[in-house]
Amino acid sequence: MNPLQPIQHSITNSQMSGGQQLEAEGSQAHNSYSHPDRISLSQLSQSAHLALDHLSTQPNTDHQRVASLVRNAVQDGKFQLQSSNDTQVTYKTSVCPPANADTMGAAHLINNELTVQARLNDQLEYDIVSAHLYGPSEAISIDASSPPSANDLASSGLSERTHLGMNRVLLRYAVPPRETEDQCVMVIDKMPPPKHGKMSFFRTTNDLSKLPLGMETGGLSDLKLAGCERISSVEQVKSIRAALGGGPLTVLDLREESHAIVNGLPITLRGPMDWANAGLSQVDGAARESAMITELKRTKSLTLVDANYVKGKKSNPQTTELKNLNVRSEREVVTEAGATYRRVAITDHNRPSPEATDELVDIMRHCLQANESLVVHCNGGRGRTTTAMIMVDMLKNARNHSAETLITRMAKLSYDYNMTDLGSISALKRPFLEDRLKFLQAFHDYARNNPSGLSLNWTQWRAKIALE
């Protein structure tokens, strides 16, 4: 990917030169859905999981084998996108025999090709339509049943409540439509850049003066936790460390979108919803950003657009031309400041995926157990940042305080970022933010039942309660 091509294209595009605002319409986004290059378990619908479970229990050993191969390939991230047509998509991988092929009836599973056909449903999850195993000596095809209705789920004993245990919530993590190259431009996130180590929406559990009198604060001051907007300078990192009392500091970057620092300015390759990298794995997203930075370092000049124009908040693009580029990654800036840099990508306006949640828990628990300072940040310092700060509070204090108490106090500390008020949220964002709130309530249950000494991670615990 050449990051400069969409920059120039978008700046000279007739829509932009005409001064029109870029808008993200839900219907347009669905019609131009960009399916992920690889599909994960978290992207499968409940119906897909039930279909695989059903096939695994059938007397037909071929069906059992294919269901097992499909589940393992999805879990290992081996399926690769082959073709798509609107909501229909095909993924393919090659399969090899297991260590004990006889136990699987897979003596001829060398150089076999496994494909699945899936359909994107209204919840932006994938239902499995069919699966096919092709090899030199056999070909097996199975059709998955259509998604069961609510009545079917209830009659099968797999209703939402019973499937995850009493009072447990069925979560529906969904990946939003990835923005196309034509939608994405290189923007300046903040102009003028912050000075003297300052940053917007900075808050720390070392300073609770923003909280109203009488609010429950038990355990907050023990977290050594901070949150803020994007980081773009060594001075900012040093300022954060000082505010947290000095000592070791981990900077946890929650941004999925490709970003860098150019001539001291924070820049991002993004579209209207900031979904340029939606659906990419952590590895693929990092590789895309690395390629962008490499290309920028070869560039002599760069024309950038004000981020608020791309978001649809301004009618004037307010372009800025930079020359003699000094390009740095956030990792380089954080490392120069003497801090540890960690990255767990979360899609903007969304909650962490199950896989990302496991990574976050590992990092957060390490900092809590080692009594090390942790600062989390996204782009604006609001949604993803507040979500992560609530998760840290829950890991430490879920046994002593309710989910409502912990969500409310961290939202209040985060400049009154009310995560429970969805009344003014756009229709495109609403399902993701509703699911984020359900996730936090479920995460409180996890943190209460899995204090730091226990070995179950988030996905293991969710699998465990699904069987209860």
Swiss-Prot record:
One of its GO terms (molecular function) is protein tyrosine phosphatase activity. Its EC number is 3.1.3.48. Induction: Transcriptionally induced by HrpL. Keywords: Hydrolase, Hypersensitive response elicitation, Phosphoprotein, Protein phosphatase, Secreted, Virulence. It is found in: Secreted. Residues 1-35 are annotated as: Disordered. Inhibited by sodium orthovanadate. The active site is at residue 378. It comes from the Bacteria. One of its GO terms (biological process) is symbiont-mediated perturbation of host programmed cell death. SMART domains: PTPlike_phytase. Its main location: secreted. Pfam families: PTPlike_phytase (PF14566). Residues 1-20 have a biased composition (Polar residues). One of its GO terms (cellular component) is extracellular region. Residues 143-468 form the Tyrosine-protein phosphatase domain. The keyword Phosphoprotein applies. InterPro entries: Prot-tyrosine_phosphatase-like (IPR029021), Tyr_Pase_AS (IPR016130), Tyr_Pase_dom (IPR000387). The keyword Secreted applies. It is an enzyme of class 3 (hydrolase). It catalyses: O-phospho-L-tyrosyl-[protein] + H2O = L-tyrosyl-[protein] + phosphate. The N-terminal domain (residues 1-142) retains 70% identity to the N-terminal 142 residues of AvrPphD, and is required for translocation into plant cells via T3SS. Effector showing tyrosine-phosphatase activity required for host defense suppression. Functions inside plant cells causing suppression of HR (hypersensitive response), PR1 gene expression and oxidative burst probably by interfering with a MAPK (mitogen-activated protein kinase) pathway. MAPK cascades are known to activate defense-related transcription factors. Inhibits plant pattern-recognition receptors (PRRs) activation. Interacts with EFR and FLS2 (via the kinase and cytoplasmic domains). This is Effector protein hopD2. It comes from Pseudomonas syringae pv. tomato (strain ATCC BAA-871 / DC3000).
